[in-house]
Design a protein with these regions (language model features):
Chain B
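N-terminal cap/lid segment of alpha/beta-hydrolase-fold proteins
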Residues: 1-11
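Conserved HGGG/HGGXW glycine-rich cap/lid loop of the alpha/beta-hydrolase fold
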Residues: 12-69
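Conserved acidic catalytic loop of the alpha/beta-hydrolase fold
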Residues: 80-98
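Flexible "cap/lid" loop of the alpha/beta hydrolase fold
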Residues: 108-116, 122-149
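Active-site nucleophile elbow and catalytic-triad environment of alpha/beta-hydrolase enzymes
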Residues: 166-183, 198-200
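Short beta-strand/loop motif that positions the catalytic acidic residue
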Residues: 187, 193-195
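Conserved alpha/beta-hydrolase "acid-adjacent" motif
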Residues: 200-206
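Catalytic histidine-centered segment of alpha/beta-hydrolase-like enzymes
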Residues: 222-234
Length: 114, 243
């Protein structure tokens, strides 16, 4: 098994927001995090949001300090992600993430009764 | 996401089972003025925190908000109309008792529900809430036009996607028509108050907690807008509900 570094940027938080302020990191360098685990708490002009981890991996770098304003698209976290040695890699620069099992849906979907 | 008819309005809500099925009392989350379940609670990481603690989460969009109907008549927003919706929802789901977690206006409604139906409420956690008048000095015939703290809140939320400024104005007037009173306090329902140290809308929360035999947890450095996603808040609530 090998590790690849992958950097996650501040996602578009919607409603035309262009930046967010880091309130509190929920992880530290060296932590192993699960996919969807709380990663960082940020505040926009509209609301406070917890961004979940997009991947399972080990935190290598946090690219912003707490109270720092980060533009959408700027680096937020670099993860070391484990890749299996027999994964197809030829011809691919970087890495195509392996799709993990879909998380169990917690929302019951039922059409409105009206 | 489901919707049901609770009285005169259709209410949208989510019903999220915990990650580990448990028979704990479900938690009813009540969002603040001008937001909705998704924005106030989901985006702030609450379903994950509560679900991870083995708790089932019920999350309505309160009338006038989110995916629920938005009447324009201020009488539709008296606190008792909201509590009737919530009791209707519990009946619909055949849930006898819940724990309540509110934020801001949702906390005021949690207090109201605990007063109205103490047999349906086990415990209540009230975030971002104190005995101060949230509408102080605001001209509610034209909310957003002035410069009071409420006018500023109104301007922010009335511009959010999916919100109806006219319905929110009616909601503000309906809420203001029944000023909060600390007396009587709910009987037999343990209360937890949680607020940011810099939250001016929660001024007096500590005294209110002391008056009604509750506890108060302060979140260092946070204000009304950014206390809701705090780990300190979530941990205090999980400890209060599960501990």
């Amino acid at each position: 098994m090998a590790e690849d570094n992958t950097t996650f940027t501040l996602p578009d938080l919607g409603e035309g927001l262009v930046e967010a302020t880091v309130l509190e990191w929920q992880v530290a360098v060296g932590d192993r995090v699960e996919r969807n685990a709380p990663l960082v708490e940020v505040e926009t002009t509209k609301s406070a949001v917890v961004i979940p981890s997009p991947t399972e991996g080990r935190v290598v770098t946090l690219h912003a300090e707490e109270n720092e304003v980060v533009p959408v698209g700027a680096p937020l976290v670099t993860f070391a992600v484990t890749v299996s040695d027999d994964a197809p890699r030829a011809g691919i620069v970087g890495k195509v993430p392996t799709e993990e099992a879909r998380p169990a849906r917690r929302v019951r979907l039922k059409p409105p009764t009206d | 996401m489901t919707a049901n008819l609770a009285g005169d309005v259709t209410m949208r809500y989510v019903d999220l089972p915990p990650s580990e099925p448990a028979d704990a009392v479900p938690v009813l989350l009540l969002h603040g003025f001008g937001t909705n379940f998704g924005m106030n609670w989901s985006a702030a990481g609450w379903p994950q925190a509560l679900g991870g603690a083995g708790l089932r989460v019920l999350g309505p969009d309160l009338r006038g908000h989110g995916g629920s109907d938005k009447p324009l008549d201020e009488a539709a927003y008296l606190p008792e109309r909201f509590t009737a919706d919530l009791l209707g929802l519990l009946d619909e789901l055949a849930v006898d008792r819940v724990d309540l977690v509110g934020y801001s206006m949702g906390s005021r409604l949690a207090w109201e529900l605990a007063l109205t139906a103490p047999d349906r409420v086990r415990r209540a956690a009230l975030g971002g809430f104190g005995p101060v008048n949230a509408f102080a000095d605001a001209d509610l015939s034209a909310p957003g036009a002035g410069d009071t703290p409420f006018d500023q809140v109104f301007r922010t939320v009335s511009g959010l996607a999916g919100n109806d400024a006219e319905a929110l104005a009616a909601c503000a007037r309906g809420q203001a028509a029944r000023p909060f009173a600390a007396d009587p306090a709910p009987v037999g329902v343990p209360l937890l108050f949680v607020s940011g140290a810099r939250d001016t809308l929660a001024t007096g929360a500590e005294d209110l907690a002391a008056r009604c035999g509750g506890t108060h947890v302060e979140i260092p450095g946070r204000d009304h807008a950014n206390a809701v996603s705090s780990r300190v808040f979530k941990q205090a609530v999980v400890d209060f509900l599960v501990g």
